[in-house]
Amino acid sequence: MDMDMGAMVGNVVPEIVLLVGGVVVLLFALFAPRRWQSGAAAIAASAAVLSAVLVTRRLVVTEQMLTFTDSYAIDHLTNWAVLFVLVATVAVIALSVAWFRQDPRHGEYYTLLLFSALGAIVLAGASDLIQLVLGLLLSSVTGYVLTAYHRRSRSSSEAGIKYFLLGALPNTGMLIGVAYLFGLAGASTYPDLGDALGPTSPALAVGAALVLVGLAFKLGAVPVHAWVPDVAQGAPAPVAAFVTAAPKVGGLIALARFVAVLPPDAIGWRPVVAILAAATMTLGNLAALWQDDLRRLLGWSAVSQTGYGLMAVVALQRSDLAVTSLLFFLAAYVLGNVAAFGVVTALRGRTDRADYQGLGRTRPLLAAVLAIGFLSFIGIPPLAGFPAKLLLFGAAIEAGYTWLAVLAVVNTVISVFYYARFLAPMYFTDPDGEGRPALLSRWASAATIACGIGVVAVGIAAEPLMRDFATALLLPG
């Protein structure tokens, strides 16, 4: 038994490093003098980088399996998800250093960031209803605090309260749904759940629907999406970058694992998810058309991107491209989203469309990064969003949802208009005369540019990445 426990612990060393790193940062923040508080960022970044190195090794040398009595999946899907979340975490730490420099006691912020990342990772690997709830709550509770972290900012506090209040009902409903399913199956692990769930019943339908709503909230999908634009606009900009990216990674993979164990003939989950995808991408794109604030536009863009990601879930078990398209979409989205919010962070205080007039002349590198992020969201080659969109459309068509792929193409065309409303003034309008906009810090600019380069690199390296993503299993299915 001791050897078995040792082996199981060894399987999750990257997650343990993140947990220990969060505790160390918290202790440092409690006892270190105020002038040393920024050192918490270095500790947090070191923990995230070490965890990323370890998970890369796990991706190469460890077989895909379930561990901890089938409650946690160590497959390539989890490993890639961990890498995506950690890339976002390291980038957001770099964005946060100067943003919170004036806060005399901000070391615990990095603890919350690491714990929130851990929550998203647990969500991605959860193969048990209890693990699913644990990941959801850890990611959500830390997200509420991070969103409202600027205590003296009315917009930050308001966004945090809205995030909490709008999440209370879906999260509570998910707990009830988990209780329903546990009562029906007499087990909480997904392998046992799949074996025990029989013919459809009202309780099974209600339980599955409540869990679906809880995960939809985490993703920012219709009809529980209203928090996303408010958080994107009101939270500290580095937090907005993180909250609109990392939980989406964990939430989409958690949803994929959950629906894969539901009885395929007893529960009509596929058309429900397809309708959610259609409604989410359409509402997100239409709402973004009228936005003049860049942060709010990115919030609605995040909603629409969730709709595209749900297409991969719809295609599960019907298309060989489903898992590959899901991973490629997440890679493209995380890099593009953090890059776009990185520009907002580097140009602190400039969020109105008029503020970006002539940015291509005054800050050409940052303007290029924002353009790369937007063009990737649209799906312009050779950026990462192009192969991601192709894979998603192909998966939906193979799964028999051609209408959803056509609607996604229409929505992609719609998105061109609101992205162009920001891109055109950056390059075809003279600066507003206020001079060159000041940068928050070199760290923020460097992280932003690195993410922009990542968007290009992933698009260029699409073929080898697709081969690697194709080896990922969706355990326990």
Region locations from a protein language model:
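Alpha-helical transmembrane segments of multi-pass membrane proteins predominantly involved
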Residues: 1-477
